């Protein structure tokens, strides 16, 4: 019944299996991918006819993780998979980026690729399997997919690269790198690194590239045995059409590209297609050419002019050389009520960034196939339409915003302090207020500035830069700090972020084949020099974290208690912890290991809650002195409450040095007294004394000998009074805003 084709290869110590002909046989291309206990179904379907009047290739990639793949039932009311998670969006983009450039340029048929995780093994990288499966499915479909792509994931521990790092290994790995490409070219790189050098990053890319070559070969074998036919494609446009457009409009295009202002240049460029279409109106009517052919030929002419200026004249749109960085302006502390804020401007790209601290209760809860976990650091990238002067409504975050935000997250995350060092959750919001190339790298720079201003003890400032490439045959030029048009017409978008000591994130998308490792080496070195220049400008404003935090930031402290005391702090049905929170106004979070985190809007509320927790969790020692309250008077003595929830008995003989006739003659209910713990009776009840305690009253409520060390938070600043707007603290140089002296 089934005509199944199966191909296997030993890869990185595991067996990779690709099969077709059994599942989803009606799809144009369908491949089942297996490695370990992971199983994915990848399908590709192409529309029979081209989509008219569209100026781009309508490729849609959908990666889905089914809950049953990990033996789970989805959460939520409906108990079924819904909107794509951020993880699914990111993997969808990861699949799209190396595949999209490899279709025939004239192909505009709608194409849908779906990769579904059917069985999930945490020991295998399902995102890599999805890229491989998508490539294999497309190779079996009629779509003119010109090259076969494969991918690999690389880790680094103790100076050794290795394939297929598991989630546990990634916790200690210095590198999490995905590289995808063909037999002869790298097409895509995505990575997070812990301050690695350019040489190490290039070596990692080479290691990953070499490792997936056997996978490319078995996909080719699978496609060859399946013998699926491909759509025959014609040239995107006739050569004579391009020549005529070049002859008539090249001069005007050249003059337009000489305009340095993006807005003015874009406005003038938008007028040219109207003129071109008007010129060819008769040819369109006679169906000699269609609109798409004319617009494509025009884009090719524009590309030739821009690229020719760079390669032949060393002349970029805005007059810079290939290594020049646009003018940089940095400001911090713009938003008085934010915990930290910064405005980073590079040329016509600008990012307004704020940082906010929260409690551990504010951490993002993520439900994944691996299980539920919390994310302490959140970075939200926002790209509003006004940033590029588009008259459009604001929408929910799209795939691009999720992807750019994650790239900036990867760049900043390696320099953040541990939770022990800084027990806050952190949210960074970066709104792109202007955009003309590399807004994600502006987000990285602005985030670093905002975090340092807020007082987050990051290990080092972080900056990012986007590199470009123009290549014709053997001649090429690597561009630093690319503009939007240089990205659009160029051959590579290469983003590198890091500190002065090394790289923290790298993302590379290549649109052409033939970019070798020598070009990558040059690009990495040029990016390093550009990154150091940007860091130098940022350091003129703020070079290290402030010692003071905003007065609006929550006060916090943490302490470690015995695990046996957790139930006492919580109380039956949460009664005790709820009472502490209500009476103190604080928030309390308790971890399973006995770490108690307390947060409050001010230090007074924090102290009230801390004292109550200590009273429950910390056992007093004999000889310690406490403040107590007389609760009940008896003939033989008095009951005194101390440490909030503990009671002890003071015998009449322990009330005063001299003999007294009655307890009531010295003490009254409600009196505040000093008491010393002198022992316990045979029932474990505390025995207290007042007469000896008065001599040691200076040591009342001492810190117990075994009391845990508490986190000491930085001092807080007054955001309003010390950050008032005036001309002095906004004086600018030609490059950067001078450092603001907000703190005494």
From Swiss-Prot:
One annotated GO biological process: RNA processing
Gene3D superfamilies given in the database record: GHMP Kinase, N-terminal domain (3.30.230.70), K Homology domain, type 1 (3.30.1370.10), Nucleic acid-binding proteins (2.40.50.140)
Major subcellular site: cytoplasm
Annotated binding of Mg(2+), by residue: 487, 493
Domain KH: start-end pairs: 554-613
Subcellular location: Cytoplasm
Keyword terms: Cytoplasm, Magnesium, Metal-binding, Nucleotidyltransferase, RNA-binding, Transferase
GO MF, any single term: magnesium ion binding
Broadest EC class assigned to this enzyme: transferase
UniProt cofactor(s): Mg(2+)
Residues covered by region (Disordered): 691-744
InterPro entries in the cross-refs: ExoRNase_PH_dom1, ExoRNase_PH_dom2, ExoRNase_PH_dom2_sf, KH_dom, KH_dom_type_1, KH_dom_type_1_sf, NA-bd_OB-fold, PNPase
EC numbers on record: 2.7.7.8
Keyword Nucleotidyltransferase tagged: yes
Catalytic activity: RNA(n+1) + phosphate = RNA(n) + a ribonucleoside 5'-diphosphate
Segments of skewed composition (Polar residues): 727-736
Family: Belongs to the polyribonucleotide nucleotidyltransferase family.
Function noted in UniProt: Involved in mRNA degradation. Catalyzes the phosphorolysis of single-stranded polyribonucleotides processively in the 3'- to 5'-direction.
Name of the protein described by the UniProt record: Polyribonucleotide nucleotidyltransferase
Species of the source: Rickettsia bellii (strain OSU 85-389)
